A protein has these predicted regions:
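Hydrophobic cores of alpha-helical transmembrane segments in multi-pass integral membrane proteins
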Residues: 2-33, 37-86, 92-123
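Short, highly charged, low-complexity non-transmembrane loops/tails of multi-pass membrane proteins
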Residues: 123-141
Length: 142
């Protein structure tokens, strides 16, 4: 539980704020009009978001499970689960954590590529995101 909590704050909150600051500062540091690619910013955001959700959620669930296993006693007052059984039960969650970490790091690599191309002065020919052709929102409530 604690590991999931700390990593959701450190990677989720601090990491995302840091990424936003880098994206804001990169074009200004190298006197560029804009970032190389806003689409890559979106790719990075979704890779990092899905990665941190998998990472933190897996650690939250496995931490609670570990705590429940450590406080389970048999009729004689001995621990019901050995340490090895606890570690074995947590293994699938470590696999999910690793997958989340890989996605988060891949997002960071996408950001590094985008910042590198921005520093070089390259511009990507991108069409802007299309806006929805849906009807406008109803009038605000009074």
């Amino acid at each position: 539980w604690t590991i999931g909590h700390v990593h959701s704050g450190a990677l989720g909150w601090v990491g995302m704020v840091s990424f936003g600051a880098i994206y804001f500062l990169a074009p200004r540091m190298w006197a560029r009009e804009r970032l190389y690619s806003l689409r890559l910013v979106s790719v990075h955001f979704w890779l990092a978001t899905v990665g941190i959700v998998l990472y933190a959620a897996a650690m939250w669930v496995s931490g609670i499970m570990q705590g429940l296993m450590w406080r389970a006693y048999d009729a004689l007052g001995f621990l019901e689960y050995s340490f090895a059984e606890t570690v074995e039960a947590m293994h699938p969650f470590y696999v999910i954590r690793a997958l989340g970490g890989v996605l988060y790091v891949l997002g960071g690599l996408v950001m590094a590529w985008n910042v590198y191309k921005t520093a070089r002065g390259d511009l990507r020919d991108e069409r802007p995101y299309e806006t929805s052709s849906a009807a406008p929102a109803a009038a605000p409530a009074e």
